[in-house]
Regions:
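A short glycine-rich, Lys/Arg-flanked "PGG" loop and its adjoining helix->strand segment in the class I
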Residues: 38-54
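Class I S-adenosyl-L-methionine
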Residues: 87-122
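Short, glycine-/aromatic-enriched active-site segment of Class I SAM-dependent methyltransferases
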Residues: 59-76
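A short SAM/SAH-binding and catalytic strip from SAM-dependent methyltransferases
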Residues: 26-39
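Flexible, glycine-/basic-rich loop-and-beta segments that form/coincide
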Residues: 113, 118-141
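Single conserved hydrophobic/aromatic residue that forms the stacking wall/gate
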Residues: 1-6, 10-11
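Conserved SAM/SAH-binding loop
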Residues: 12-16, 34
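A short acidic, Gly/Pro-enriched loop at the edge of an enzyme's catalytic core
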Residues: 17-27
Length: 141
């Protein structure tokens, strides 16, 4: 078991390739800031065909500026639902499938609701109750 930490790394300035790793990773955990995970997932999906991915979905970086409120907070549940449905549809275009989807048990730094998505290349026909996941969001204290 080996863990490589990429905190403080600007993924926009880095080209990620399977050749960079020996052995090739089979798992990635993503918690990125100030960037949509849509900019990172295609590289992971292409370069690491057997990789499982757990990604933190942050609606404030996925919804688009027009749907993000004051101070970068997304409060509208409809926007959360749109973001999650859109993300579920998007990952399929990359050959990835959502195997688990849930609300994060902690809020983002500024109080944003965030969600955890477990992705694999293994096909599944799971359907997630996105509306319920959003509406029943609770934070553990």
């Amino acid at each position: 078991l080996r863990c490589l930490v990429g905190s403080e790394m600007c993924i926009r300035d880095s080209y990620l390739s399977g050749d960079m790793f020996d052995p090739r990773p089979d798992f990635a955990c993503m918690d990125v800031s100030f960037i949509s995970i849509r900019q990172i997932l295609p590289v992971l999906a292409e370069q690491f065909a057997d990789m499982e991915i757990v990604a933190l979905v942050k609606p404030q970086f996925e919804a688009g500026r027009a749907k993000v409120g004051k101070h970068g907070i997304v409060k509208n549940e409809k926007v959360h639902i749109e973001v999650l449905q859109s993300m579920c549809d998007y990952v399929k275009t990359l050959g990835l499938y959502v195997h688990h989807l849930c609300a994060s048990s902690v809020l983002g730094r500024d109080g944003n609701k965030e969600f955890v998505m477990h992705l694999k290349h293994t096909q599944t026909h799971k359907v997630f109750p996105i509306r319920d996941i959003v509406k029943n969001y609770t934070v553990k204290r």
